[in-house]
Curated annotation (Swiss-Prot):
GO CC annotations on file: cytosol; nucleus; preribosome, small subunit precursor
Family note: Belongs to the LTV1 family.
Keywords assigned by UniProt, alphabetized: Coiled coil, Ribosome biogenesis
UniProt GO BP: ribosomal small subunit biogenesis; ribosomal small subunit export from nucleus; ribosome biogenesis
The protein's name in its UniProt record: Protein LTV1 homolog
Function of the protein: Essential for ribosome biogenesis.
Pfam families: LTV
Biased segments, Acidic residues type: 185-217
Residue ranges the record marks as coiled coil: 412-467
Source superkingdom: Eukaryota
Biased composition (Polar residues): 83-93
Amino acid composition bias (Basic and acidic residues), ranges on this chain: 44-53, 175-184, 411-453
Length: 469
């Protein structure tokens, strides 16, 4: 059998290479547990050297792997790019009569279709998932100041007004607190007190007419007309349960407090918004556009002064006002002081040493302090020093004559055992003599010091005993 070349499983020219990377934090599926956290990123097949050479032609000299050419496009008229191309090709078929016909030829699609979940999302959010979860720093204007103070440990817990009583729940449910809250309400004028015994306006909370007489006098119950109740609210996110629950006095009081709280954030005047961008299309023959133009011309006509209504006196007044404005215009002129100018001779004199003698300023030496002996009270280094006595000179000569050359501690290469033994013995004797000499020197210096101290004490006593006549 002839050898047939096997078709490769993957064709390198038509193959697409992907990189397995982590999903972006701005991807909406980053927080989805069911979606894979790693996606496929198509690899760029373009030659790096060729791309960098083309970038240098356009003036881009950055030495990195980023493709800056993707932000460039050719100058010219805009053209329409079709969203999808047809996968069918046409081939020409010639009949026996010589007629040519085009017949569509279907091209098979890709053999492998990857799901969209393995790729990154087409749309990304402006803020990533980690930045959303980052802690908020700085001023929190949307929080209660008392809560912010408590979090920052600036809340005064010792103030009696900031402390709750043990029975604060009973105090909140008491009749006195409800009555005082109703008296302080600014919207009490919108309600009408109705006697419970009246037949015309006797309604219960459900809106039905009550035929029973609940009592008269001090125990009579006050109710309000439903038609006069303000039903408009600033809240738009009521739950399903709150819309059907019967509003008792506590819930009504809570609603009123929320209404009062949100009244503080109402805008008295709502004007035009800044930097408003309007997009859209309006016909030039539109009636709305004509109304806007007419309103503009009417407003301009009101602001301008017509010639028939302008008198000569008015014209003179306007001229005089313009003259006064011209006279009143004042300009502030800053006059700078003239700088000192140097001529050629003066500036050259600073470079010569004819009149300029630069030198280093020396620090004068400090005066030497007089040191006084603690024992004698006499200034030191004043009396002349005494020389050595005959006994001291004899001792020094004996010490100098007793000096012997030191024995070498380094052995020779050709040293025998007897020589080494003799050398070690000599070293021991030398060290012994040195110790004896050192001890004798210490004793001699100690005796000399004690003798000098005694002489100084005697000298001090003799000086104090002198009497000047």
């Amino acid at each position: 059998m002839p050898h047939r070349k096997k078709k490769p499983f993957i064709e390198n020219k038509k193959a697409v290479t992907f990189h397995l990377v982590h999903r972006s934090q701005r991807d909406p599926l980053a927080a989805d547990e069911t979606a894979p956290q790693r996606v496929l990123l198509p690899a760029d097949k373009a030659d790096t050297e060729k791309r960098k050479e083309e970038q240098r032609d356009f003036g881009v000299f950055f030495d990195d792997d980023y493709n800056y050419l993707q932000h460039l496009k050719e100058r010219g008229p805009s053209e329409l790019i079709p969203s999808a191309t047809s996968k069918s090709k046409s081939c020409i078929i010639t009949d026996q009569d010589g007629d040519k016909e085009k017949e569509p030829q279907h091209v098979p699609g890709p053999s492998i279709n990857l799901p969209s979940s393995v790729f990154a999302s087409e749309f990304e959010e402006d803020v990533g998932l980690l930045n959303k979860a980052a802690p908020v720093r700085g001023l929190c204007l949307d929080l209660d100041p008392d809560i912010v103070a408590a979090l920052d440990e600036d809340f005064d817990f010792d103030d009696p007004e900031n402390q709750l009583d043990d029975d604060f729940i009973l105090q909140a449910n008491s009749d006195d607190l409800r009555r005082s809250s109703h008296e302080k309400d600014d919207d009490d004028d919108d309600w009408e007190d109705v006697e419970s015994g009246s037949e015309e306006n006797d309604y219960d909370s459900d809106g039905t007419v009550s035929d029973e007489d609940d009592g008269e006098g001090d125990g009579a119950r006050k109710e309000f007309l439903f038609m006069q109740e303000e039903t408009k609210s600033r809240f738009t996110e009521y739950s399903m349960t709150s819309s059907v629950i019967r509003r008792n006095e506590q819930l009504t009081l809570l609603d009123e407090r929320f209404e009062k709280f949100y009244e503080q954030f109402d805008d008295d005047e709502i004007g035009a918004l800044d930097n408003t961008e309007l997009e859209g299309f309006i016909d030039s023959n539109s009636g709305r556009l004509e109304e806007v133009i007419n309103d503009y011309y009417k407003q301009k006509a009101k602001d301008c002064v017509k010639l028939k209504n302008l008198t000569p006196r008015d014209g003179m007044d306007s001229v005089t006002e313009e003259d006064d404005e011209d006279k009143e215009d004042m300009q502030t002129i800053v006059i700078e002081e003239p700088r000192e100018k140097w001529d050629c001779e003066s500036i050259l004199s600073t470079y010569s040493n004819l009149y300029n003698h630069p030198q280093i300023i020396k620090d004068p030496p400090k005066a030497k302090l007089i040191r006084v002996s603690v024992k004698t009270g006499i200034p030191m280094d004043v009396l002349p020093g005494r020389g050595l006595t005959a006994k001291q000179v004899e001792r020094m000569e004996m010490i100098n004559s007793s000096d012997i050359p030191r024995v070498s501690t380094h052995p020779r290469k050709d040293e025998s055992k007897e020589e080494r033994k003799a050398r070690k013995q000599a070293i021991k004797e030398e060290r012994k003599e040195r110790r004896v000499e050192k001890k004798s020197n210490k004793l001699a210096f100690k005796e000399e010091k004690s003798r000098q101290v005694k002489e100084q004490l005697n000298l001090k006593q003799n000086l104090q005993g002198l009497k000047l006549s």
